[in-house]
């Protein structure tokens, strides 16, 4: 389960970076060259999703829980926004959902 969660976390970072760089280009007048590493990051994100042993729908559903937590970590450490009790509560619920889905992969 740790390996799966770590892989989800790395996958989420690739997705967030792949979306953040075009955002910088569009919203903060960043260089158009930001689109090149964004494309690479998103391609890597898609490839990482293929490494999971479950059906794609289950992978996407379980990945969503880790994505929520990773996005909130990004909010805190990259955007510099303090997390609220609601943020922490939502992340915990999402992570619990992910753990339930992953625990059932071999039983479905």
From Swiss-Prot:
Positions in the Cytoplasmic compartment:
27-30, 82-84
**Membrane topology designation:** Multi-pass membrane protein
Alphabetized, the UniProt keywords read: Cell inner membrane, Cell membrane, Membrane, Transmembrane, Transmembrane helix
Periplasmic side, ranges: 1-5, 52-60, 106-108
Q: Which InterPro entries match?
A: UPF0060
HAMAP family, sorted? UPF0060
The record's subcellular location field reads: Cell inner membrane
* GO CC annotation: plasma membrane
Residue ranges of coiled coil: none
This protein is called UPF0060 membrane protein YnfA
Bilayer-crossing regions: 6-26, 31-51, 61-81, 85-105
The gene coding this protein: ynfA
Q: Per UniProt, what is one Pfam family of this protein?
A: UPF0060
- Which family, according to UniProt? Belongs to the UPF0060 family.
């Amino acid at each position: 389960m740790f390996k799966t969660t770590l892989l989800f976390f790395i996958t989420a970072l690739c997705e967030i970076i792949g979306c953040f760089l075009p955002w910088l280009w569009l919203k903060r007048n960043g260089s158009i060259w930001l689109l090149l590493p964004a494309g690479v990051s998103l391609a890597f994100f898609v490839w990482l999703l293929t490494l999971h042993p479950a059906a794609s729908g289950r992978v996407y559903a379980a990945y969503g829980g880790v994505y929520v937590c990773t996005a909130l970590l990004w909010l805190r450490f990259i955007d510099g926004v303090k997390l609220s009790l609601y943020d922490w509560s939502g992340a915990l619920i999402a992570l619990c959902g992910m753990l339930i889905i992953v625990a059932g992969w071999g039983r479905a």
